[in-house]
Amino acid sequence: MLKFIDPTERWNVFTHALGVILGIGVSIYFFAQHSSEQPRVLIALGIYCFSLVFLFSASTTYHAVSGDIKLIWRKVDHIAILFLIAGTYTPVTLTLFYETSGVWILTGVWSIAAVGFIFKIFFTGRFEILSLIMYLGMGWFILLDAQTVWELFSTNAFIFLILGGSCYTIGVFFYRWKGYKEAHAIWHIWVLAGALSHAFMINEILLIN
């Protein structure tokens, strides 16, 4: 299949096709292991799992296609990033944070995602620094309630939280590195690492909740 794809995009397709497999595997695991959770938690998990598979599917498709449709899929790809960030927050805020700051954190990140959705419809490919600030701001939004994070997160969950956020943040360097043709594929690897770390974080939270 890869021989029909632009050679400059092959590694980009391959890395996030692995992400699709990862997302499906994580989804199967979560619903197999946590099927007895409350409906609220199962809905939150469904949103997270969908956002995970959606992100990697959109990215893989964007890098695989060519022609005019590529611009459409670029918009979908960027919107999927917003959706994954907010989707990752959803099971965290509706379980561990549910009786504290969960509602306002969840409302905040999904509100930013909604604004970002409109922004990306019209301005994908423009104002990239603003986009990165929006992504990173959403990602670290939880630290606005750092005290609750410190009090409620287990050691393992906290480690995976910071590890995942750090992977995404470090990956931005490669995303912005335009002079090295393989930099975007390396960015994809950092995204995979960040997504996997946050999947472990969510699992830890479900185990202690």
Ranges and model annotations:
Residues M1-N209:
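Multi-pass alpha-helical transmembrane bundles in non-GPCR membrane proteins
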